[in-house]
Amino acid sequence: MASYFDEHDCEPTNPEEQYRQNALLELARSLMQGLDIDSGSFDLSDWDQRLPPPAAKAVVQSLPVVIISPEQADKGVKCPVCLLEFEEQESVREMPCKHLFHTGCILPWLNKTNSCPLCRLELPTDNADYEEFKKDKERRRQREHRLEDLHGAMYT
């Protein structure tokens, strides 16, 4: 039995493209119905709906290379990506969060996303829009925290 995509001679859309298509459809529906449009909901650079960009190339290249010590090798420390034990005197990459990875495991990961596979600590990116989004998100979080503190101080 042929798949839906084969029968209709089309390809599945990626999540980013699907988000854009949905936003455009919603815009068209609103225009057809003569409704007020909230322009904020049609921001096509909405990073809450998209995958983060790759880590900055300069940051990835500057990740420290660490040599596995005999103690670490004896403990059976493993690469969290491939699950192979590190060997004594093996060169591995250390993330800012201190997690260790084989170079061949972590570099492809960081070419797709900007975070540690274990703890999700984010590295800087080369995408100015995403960096601005992160700053704005942090400002909103701080503002909410200050508001909670103020509210708590009023009622204690």
Curated annotation (Swiss-Prot):
A zinc finger (RING-type) spans 79-120. The gene is rnf181. The keyword Zinc-finger applies. Signal peptide: none annotated. Belongs to the RNF181 family. GO terms for molecular function: ubiquitin protein ligase activity; zinc ion binding. SUPFAM superfamilies: RING/U-box (SSF57850). GO terms for biological process: protein ubiquitination. This is E3 ubiquitin-protein ligase RNF181.
